[in-house]
Amino acid sequence: MENVDWAALPFNYHKTDYNVRISYKDGKWGEPELTQDEYISVHMSAPCLHYGVESFEGLKAFRGADGKVRLFRPDENGKRFAATARKLCMAELPVETFVEMCRMVVKANERFVPPYGTGATLYLRPLEIGMGAFLGVHPAKEFMVCVFVSPVGAYFKEGIKPIRVIVNPDYDRAAPRGTGDVKCGGNYAASLEAGEEANREGYANSMFVDAVHRKYIEECGAANFFGIKDNTYITPKSTSILPSI
C-alpha cells in the first residue's frame, strides 16, 4: 500500500484483497477457501440473526524489524474460539484449522501488513455464525467460519497512553454463570449503552463491576483489566470475564 499515513491509521475496517471461509454441514467441516467476496449470504431465518448463534475472535499480525510477519499466539485464540463454540452449542473448529486459516489470510494479504515501527498492525477477525433456516430455539446444524483482516491503528484514539474510564455499577456486562467468559456478540451489545454514556461524560470506556456484589472490578467493555502490586501481575478472580491472551 502506498501513500498511507500508518501512524494516523484509525481502528476501523479497511478493504483488503481476500478473506478465508470454511463451512460445516452434514456433521463435518469442509476445506478452507480464499475469496474476494466481502459479503455473506444467509437465510432470513438463520439463527445467527435471531438467537445470537455467533462468535468471534480478535488477534493481530505484526511486521518485525527483520521484515518478517508474525502472528501472536494464534493457537490460544483458536482454543478460546472453540470454548465459545462449546458454550453456544456450535460446531468446534479444530485449533489447527483455525491457525491454518489465519496464516492463509495473512499470507494472501501480506501487502497490507503495516511497516515495523509505525504502531499499526494487521488485525484478524475470525467469526463463526449459525446458518440454515429454522424458527425454533435450538442449536444450529450448519455453520460458517470466516476470517477477514484489516490494517488498523490503536483501538483507543489516545494510542498507547493512559486512558480515563468510569466505574459505573448501574450496568452489568454479563450474568454470573452466563456467557461472560466467552467471546460472543451479545456480551458486546450489552456493553454499548454503558460505553456510550462513558463517552458522553468524557471517558474512553466503562469499567464493569461484578453483577453479584456490584463492587469488584471485572473488565471494560472492550478490554481486560489487570493491576501490578509488589511486582505481581493481578487479574480479577471471576468466572464471568473473558480470559485474556
Predicted regions, residues:
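Helix-start/capping segments and mature chain N-termini
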Residues: 1-101, 105, 135-245
